[in-house]
């Protein structure tokens, strides 16, 4: 039975970043359900926007994005829509439009060969015994059993590691549903849509490489029905759909209290969305995935006496920032407050009157 210093479950942005940073310094094994190349197998449903905090992380690491990861076009504003109030506003944003699956595969490709990576693999069972973490996984057509001193859960919203460590922990979840359509809009755009009759979270759209992606986060019970209902409403705002080319769905976490951020215990650690590190106001998680990976790298290499305590303390600033996003989310999803903010015109950039496409409701007050 092979033994490692660190076993990482999941190679999204968090797991890939950590594996890359620990390579050559610790003996690392990493398991991921995505394939190494191509579009077959699992891909993460995501709007695919790289926030400024994530961009800063790449600056610190001296990394630049390859052209095949960057999507077309690059959009400089978010069109915010309040459906019930028939209001539309434009707010400046500095996101980079990316192909999320290509981005994930690129992140994996940066992991040095010294890390033992198993692609298209499935983690079957984990447990702790004799001060070691035991992992049984299936890869290359057969089951393998390894042990590790430290276990890292970077396995997202449905984290197996989080469920093992905190079997009674409950965090609010939504089903994220996305559909892809051939782009019909004369001018591409990115939008954020609020409609409390549909969801107490939010919906979105993004133009990407000739496609129009429309999605949102909805209650688990009847998400598909609500998604369809919102699509019908958006015709009043000049959204154009047609026949869906592709449909995607996944679970997304929605932290709503301080206790929703869990860091791990017993030499097991959680990073990225597995730890609840995702913005409640935008559902953006890549920047927090990268930040938590860097924090854990620093803790593991310093090897303090109590690693879990050290990691919890080191993530306090990150958790406080995310708690602020919970407060912001409550403001954005409160109909009266949101309507007042949007009507105030604060930070709104109006489009020129002779602009050919405005994507507003006929009753919208600009």
Swiss-Prot record:
This is Protein CbrA. Pfam families: FAD_binding_3. One of its GO terms (molecular function) is FAD binding. InterPro entries: FAD-bd, FAD/NAD-bd_sf, Geranylgeranyl_reductase. Signal peptide: none annotated. PANTHER family: CONDITIONED MEDIUM FACTOR RECEPTOR 1, GERANYLGERANYL DIPHOSPHATE REDUCTASE. It comes from the Bacteria. Disulfide bonds: none annotated. SUPFAM superfamilies: FAD/NAD(P)-binding domain. Belongs to the CbrA family.
